[in-house]
């Protein structure tokens, strides 16, 4: 499993914080950030890498998380969530089988961002009664 991470200019500093944290937790990271990328481009780049392997997960950081989230939801087969708290990050894996989260660097601080990332990458899909919803999401787009 790889954690694919990317950020636009507004999210660069926080991306480095999250990246360093996850690397210290021994996760394999792929950073697709390129200088001057808009949140649209970076979200598409993260999604492309995430979709290469079923186990891959993605994290995109921009100013507010909303722009990247809107892009991610336009990608066929991508289930994404905009999160700004640890519980939502964890639960979106468990209940929605989300493969990507977006965060806003102007909304969350360093420690919260690390905890959000940790909750997301450590979350496991629960299946069962949640599969009906996931099937509905996967039929869309």
From Swiss-Prot:
It is an enzyme of class 5 (isomerase). It comes from the Bacteria. GO terms for biological process: D-allose catabolic process; galactose catabolic process; lactose catabolic process via tagatose-6-phosphate; pentose-phosphate shunt, non-oxidative branch. It holds the Pfam family LacAB_rpiB. Pathway: Carbohydrate metabolism; D-galactose 6-phosphate degradation; D-tagatose 6-phosphate from D-galactose 6-phosphate: step 1/1. Its EC number is 5.3.1.26. Keywords: Isomerase, Lactose metabolism. It catalyses: aldehydo-D-galactose 6-phosphate = keto-D-tagatose 6-phosphate. InterPro entries: LacA, RpiB_LacA_LacB, RpiB_LacA_LacB_sf. GO terms for molecular function: galactose-6-phosphate isomerase activity; ribose-5-phosphate isomerase activity. Belongs to the LacAB/RpiB family. NCBIfam families: lacA, PRK08621.1, PRK12613.1, rpiB_lacA_lacB. Heteromultimeric protein consisting of LacA and LacB. PANTHER family: GALACTOSE-6-PHOSPHATE ISOMERASE SUBUNIT LACA, RIBOSE-5-PHOSPHATE ISOMERASE B. This is Galactose-6-phosphate isomerase subunit LacA. It comes from Streptococcus pneumoniae (strain ATCC 700669 / Spain 23F-1). The lineage of its organism: Bacteria, Bacillati, Bacillota, Bacilli, Lactobacillales. The gene is lacA.
């Amino acid at each position: 499993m790889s954690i694919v991470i990317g950020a636009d200019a507004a999210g660069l500093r926080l991306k480095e914080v999250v990246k360093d944290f996850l690397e210290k937790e021994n996760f394999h990271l792929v950073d697709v950030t390129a200088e001057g990328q808009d949140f649209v481009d970076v979200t598409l780049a993260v999604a492309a890498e995430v979709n290469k392997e079923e186990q891959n997960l993605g994290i995109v950081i921009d100013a507010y998380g909303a722009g990247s989230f809107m892009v991610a939801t336009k990608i066929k087969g991508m289930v994404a969530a905009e999160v700004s708290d640890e519980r939502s990050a964890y639960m979106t894996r468990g209940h929605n089988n989300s493969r990507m989260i977006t965060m806003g660097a102007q909304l969350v601080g360093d420690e919260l961002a690390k905890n959000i990332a940790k909750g997301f990458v450590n979350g496991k899909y629960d299946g069962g009664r949640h599969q009906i919803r996931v099937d509905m999401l996967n039929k869309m787009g």
